[in-house]
Amino acid sequence: MRAPFSPFRAADPAPPGTGLVVIPTGRARSNHAEVARSLGTAIIAGRFAAGAKLPGDGDLLATYRVSRPVLRESVKTLVAKGLLTTKARVGTVVRERAAWNMFDADVLAWHLEAGIDRRFLRDLAEIRLAVEPAAAALAAERRTPDDLAALEAGLARMRAAPSDSEGFSEGDLALHVAVAVASGNPFMRSIGGVIEVALRASFQLSAPVEPAERETTLAAHARIVAAIAARDPAAAAAAITEVIHNGLRRHGAAA
């Protein structure tokens, strides 16, 4: 009797020897979202190569124990995110990585669950370096009192929390998101998902942060807030660039 199809699941450890680090996201999901997550994570983890055909509906239905409409909705979700394509007389096929929507929040989260490596972190840092300094410069020019209050709140949360705590990382994330919001550019804000994944991955890989490193991190983030408060675009861009490079250095992904 044929064994049922069983994709690589995000809850499992990354395969040995891959150099990947799995970071659980702990997100609640509906049935169709859970199936999409499991299949999406399996694709990202390399369980299905580009050009490979997915198992038939019968195998997938037996594996996930969901209705056919739920399965179809899950596949549609993955098609919309660029991971799959449907071909007449062929079936459902995995697309090349270049076609994946890497700005999609689910696709980014599935990368964390599948297991990330240093190259992935460098890729994230490169897009951050292309966007965040510009966002910080715009924030220095356009910030409102409410924007400044949000920046200061994020920094205060970091200062109040131990460096290996969720509060520290959430404060860090809140500060960076506040920079994007303060830029006044909706496209800058939309990249928040990339920033969130980068920060969560960096924090997981580098935690616990040593006390001396904690002070360095706090001081660097304080310079971002101070530059935006002073309406100094060049200083704000330089400060956030320093923070991104420091993060790369901490987890060993610097070029």
Name every feature range the model reports, one short phrase each.
Residues 1-130, 137, 255:
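Short linear motifs at protein or domain termini
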Residues 2-17, 27, 155, 159-160, ...:
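C-terminal all-alpha effector/ligand-binding and dimerization domain
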Residues 4-9, 99-178, 216-239:
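All-alpha effector-binding/dimerization core of bacterial HTH-type transcriptional repressors
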Residues 25, 32, 144, 165, ...:
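Flexible, glycine- and charge-enriched loops at secondary-structure boundaries
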Residues 34, 38, 130, 150-153, ...:
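Generic alpha-helical secondary structure signal
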Residues 146, 186-187:
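Cytosolic histidine kinase catalytic core of two-component systems
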Residues 182-183:
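Transmembrane helix irregularities
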